[in-house]
C-alpha cells in the first residue's frame, strides 16, 4: 500500500505517511501528513 504524500489526508491512517512525514491535526481542519518538525 502506498504511503501518504505531504499535505494529503491521513485520518485513520496515522502510520501511513511517507518517510519524513507525520500525521498532524490542523486547527479546524482534518489530519494531514506534514514534514516532521525537529524536536528542539
UniProtKB/Swiss-Prot annotation:
Gene3D superfamilies: 6.20.10.10. Changing residue 37 to A: Does not significantly modify the ability to inhibit rASIC1a channel. The keyword Kinase does not apply. Belongs to the psalmotoxin-1 family. Keywords: Disulfide bond, Ion channel impairing toxin, Knottin, Pharmaceutical, Proton-gated sodium channel impairing toxin, Secreted, Toxin. One of its GO terms (molecular function) is ion channel regulator activity. Coiled coil: none annotated. Changing residue 36 to A: 1.8-fold increase in ability to inhibit rASIC1a channel. This peptide is present at only 0.4% abundance in P.cambridgei venom. Disulfide bonds join 3-18, 10-23, 17-33. Changing residue 25 to A: No change in ability to inhibit rASIC1a channel. It is found in: Secreted. The presence of a 'disulfide through disulfide knot' structurally defines this protein as a knottin. The record marks 7, 24, 26-28, 30 as: Key residue for interaction with ASIC1a. Changing residue 30 to A: Loss of ability to inhibit rASIC1a at low concentration and gain of function as a positive modulator at high concentrations, probably by stabilizing the open state of the channel. This is Psalmotoxin-1. It comes from the Eukaryota.
Amino acid at each position: 500500500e502506498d504511503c501518504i504524500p505531504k499535505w494529503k489526508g491521513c485520518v485513520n491512517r496515522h502510520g501511513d505517511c511517507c518517510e519524513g512525514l507525520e500525521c498532524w491535526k490542523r486547527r479546524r481542519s482534518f489530519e494531514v501528513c506534514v514534514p516532521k518538525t525537529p524536536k528542539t
